[in-house]
C-alpha cells in the first residue's frame, strides 16, 4: 500500500468552493486560503439556524494504546461511507498540534484512503489559528510581567501567578524557566515556564465560545493569579482582553477542508484531551449541524476523556443533544488490555501480539464493555467501530462483534484505511440504524452540585472508581473556588488517557480503586474547574528519535517524511 503522503498527493482536490456547495455553504461565506482551504464566516450559523436538523454523532474510542487506535481515520472513513449510502455528512475535527506532528505520534490527518486534505497544511500551520492562540496567550503573559515591572498597581502576588507562556513544539527544556534576569530594566525575576499551545486556556476558550462577544467576555474572565488580599486578578483587570480578542478574531472562524473523497470537513480548535476539554469547537458543530444529514464530531482519546467532556461541557454550552456515539476499537488495543503485551511508541508490536488469538481479545474485552457502559450512561446509542488492520484475524474480529452486541451496542468492522468510504459502508448503515432510536440524553451531574460532588460522580459513574481522595490543599482550594462563585462550573479531570484510572499501568476496567485528587485549578475564562490526578505534564518532550528527524524538503519544494 502507498504511504499516506503519496495517497494525499495523488488524491484529487476539489476547489474548496465546490466542497462548500456540497455542504450547502454559499461562496459568499468563504474566505479562501489557497485552493484547498477556506475560513467559514460565522454568519453561516445564523443562516442555517432554521435548517439545524442533522443527526449529531460523536466519535470516541475505547482506552487507546500509546499509538492511538485510528479515531480520526475512522471518523473520516465514516463520513465517506455515509456519502456512499446517500447520506450527506459533515465532519468536525480538532486541529492537530505541531508538537506531536514532530514528535513520535506524527500528524492527525487520518490514514490511507481516509485522510483530510491538504494533509501537509492541516498538520502544520493551516490558517494560523494556533499561532493566533499562542500570540494572544503570550501577550497576556507579557502584560503580566510588564505590570509587575511598572509598579504592580494591582498588587499582584508574584508567587500566585499561574499564567505561563506557550509554544507549539514539544520542548521539555522550557517546562521550568526564570524570567526577568539581567538588570533592573529587564523585568522582575520570577519562576515560570512554558506549556504547549494545545494546553492553553485561550485555545479552550476558542473551542467553547459561541460568538465573538462570548469570546471577548471569556477572555476577560481569565484569572492569572491573585493579589495580596487573595482576590483574583483577571485579564480584564490588566486591560489585555481586548487586544487578545483582536488577535483571535479570524481564528474564531472554522476552517473548511475535504476528505480524500471530497466530503466536507470543518477543522477548528485543538485543546488537549487529557488536560483540557479535548474537542473541536462549538461554533464548528453549529455550522456543521445545519449543513448535512449527519454531523460527525470527534472527541479526544477514550469515552472517559474527550467524550465525557463532550457530553457534560460541550453539549451544555452548544445547546445540542447527541443522537449516537461511535466507539472506535482495535484488536491490538483489546489485546493490550488483556495485560499480556506492552505497546511502546516507536517500536514494532510484539510478534506474539499479531498471532491469531481470540482469547487475548476476550481477556481485554472488559475495557470495551466499560466504554459501552459509559456511553449508555449518557443515554446515547453506542456503535462499536472495529478499525481493522491487515494483521487482524477473522475469529478475532468475530470475538469483538460478540462482545459489542452482548453489551447492547451496534457493531461494524471497517476497512476504510485501505478501501476508503467503500470500506465503511457497514459502519455507515450501523450509525444510521443507531440514530433511528431516539436518545434519552442526560448529564453525569447537575451544575448545582458541589464541586466535590461533580468530581465524585465523574470518578464513580464514568471511570468506575469507588470514590475520590482529595489532598488537603486541594480541598482547601475547592472551598475557595466555591466562595469565589465558581461552584456552578462543570469539571474536568486531568488524568492519563492510557487507563480508565489515574494510573496508566492499570489496564482493562480496574475495580477497587479510588481517584486521588492532588491539585485543583480554575480555568475561569473557559468556565470550568479542573482536578489534576496523577503525573500530568502540560509540556511534552521529544523522544530519542522524533518524527522531525525524518521530515525534509526536496528541490521541488515537496515535503518528505510527513505522516
From Swiss-Prot:
An annotated GO BP: tetrahydrofolate interconversion
EC number(s) recorded for this UniProt protein: 6.3.4.3
Gene Ontology MF terms: ATP binding; formate-tetrahydrofolate ligase activity
Keyword entries, A-Z: ATP-binding, Ligase, Nucleotide-binding, One-carbon metabolism
Highest rank taxon of the organism: Bacteria
Known catalytic reactions: (6S)-5,6,7,8-tetrahydrofolate + formate + ATP = (6R)-10-formyltetrahydrofolate + ADP + phosphate
SUPFAM superfamilies xref list: P-loop containing nucleoside triphosphate hydrolases
Binding of ATP, residues: 65-72
Pathway: One-carbon metabolism; tetrahydrofolate interconversion
Keyword Metal-binding among UniProt keywords: no
Family: Belongs to the formate--tetrahydrofolate ligase family.
The protein, known as: Formate--tetrahydrofolate ligase
Organism: Cutibacterium acnes (strain DSM 16379 / KPA171202) (Propionibacterium acnes)
